Amino acid sequence: MVDPVALARALIQAPSVTPMDHGCQDLLIRHLEDLGFTVHRLRFGHVENFYARLGSKGRNFTFAGHTDVVGAGDTSRWSSDPFAATLEEGYITGRGAVDMKGGLACMVAATARFLAARPHFAQQHSLSFLITGDEEGDALDGTLKVLQWLESQQEKMDYCLVGEPTSAAQLGDCIKNGRRGSVNGRLTIRGVQGHVAYPHLVDNPIHRAAPVLAAISSMTFDQGDRFFQPTSLQFTAVQSGGSATNVVPGELTAGFNIRFSAMHTPESLEARIRQVLDGAEVDYDLQMMTSGLPFITEGGPLVEAVKATVAQVTGLEPQLSTGGGTSDARFISRHCVQTVEFGLVGSTMHKVDERVPVADLEVLTEVYRRLLERLYPPQG
């Protein structure tokens, strides 16, 4: 039987900072092959990915996740080696403990326990794993390309659970049944460079930009709805000029990000911003790049099954949420209508001394195991 604690520690000890894998996926693959899964290793560029499937009939339930992690930063600030997976006082400390190697370990352990009680499961049903090594990076050679490969192989996912750390304060308090979209923008406002002592010979782009940036930052796109928070635009960088104090710069650049709901498209958001810019009569260039589209799984068998199972195991009534950042569910939901995210408490992810309670690993394993039981009840 697979021990989620031991597997989580082994995964953390592989320093798989994007895009390096360092044998992390091999650990998962060995366990899955032992359980009878057929594994397809899918390397795109410098990124390791794999898709594993057990069975070829019935509905296909997919566990999805990522083995890559963000860097540890200044390791001197950690209480222990970030890749030692230190086990102390009921916690495992290490990079990726909650995001999301702990969740991966629980998925595999739950699958092993479920199949031990259902040795003939694959004769009528299917289980699969979609695992990438490029979620924390640009996400160009990861899940997106695996999904393209699955489509070329006519592989279908009926249900998908992404094991991101969705819980807020307690394991089981939050399920993500959707995510906001994300668009990054770069705005350049051009003027005329010159000496500060000759204002009649310059056109100061900073002066031009100030009211424009204020107008854009105060835009109201919507009021939100029962699934999504109001759309939010935040400026992330403003740059103009150099170190000289007597030169009016020739241009100003500003970066921004928009998190938006399913009420909008990237094109409609860009049109709203251009409307403000055109009305300001400034010389500008606007570039916008979509990093993720919004999705929502409003209801259906998977949402209801996850809610009921979490409540059964944890005793909590989980809230459905679309808040927070983006995840690979934004890609998967285009291929699998029933896509939901549920996992560990994410309060320490990406931080110094990221850690997970050992007890939570056991509880999450039980949630995942009982979820499989609920979706695939014994026949007869």
Swiss-Prot record:
Binding site for Zn(2+) 2: D99, E136, H350
Active site: D68, E135 (proton acceptor)
Record-listed E.C. numbers: 3.5.1.18
Pathway entry: Amino-acid biosynthesis; L-lysine biosynthesis via DAP pathway; LL-2,6-diaminopimelate from (S)-tetrahydrodipicolinate (succinylase route): step 3/3
Catalytic activity: N-succinyl-(2S,6S)-2,6-diaminopimelate + H2O = (2S,6S)-2,6-diaminopimelate + succinate
GO molecular function, one term: cobalt ion binding
Residues involved in Zn(2+) 1 binding: H66, D99, E164
Pfam family of the protein (one): Peptidase_M20
Keyword Cell membrane: no
Entry's cofactor comment: Binds 2 Zn(2+) or Co(2+) ions per subunit.
Keywords: Amino-acid biosynthesis, Cobalt, Diaminopimelate biosynthesis, Hydrolase, Lysine biosynthesis, Metal-binding, Zinc
Cofactors required: Zn(2+); Co(2+)
Keyword flag Amino-acid biosynthesis: yes
Similarity annotation: Belongs to the peptidase M20A family. DapE subfamily.
Subunit description: Homodimer.
Function text: Catalyzes the hydrolysis of N-succinyl-L,L-diaminopimelic acid (SDAP), forming succinate and LL-2,6-diaminopimelate (DAP), an intermediate involved in the bacterial biosynthesis of lysine and meso-diaminopimelic acid, an essential component of bacterial cell walls.
Protein name, per record: Succinyl-diaminopimelate desuccinylase
Source organism (scientific name): Magnetococcus marinus (strain ATCC BAA-1437 / JCM 17883 / MC-1)
Gene: dapE
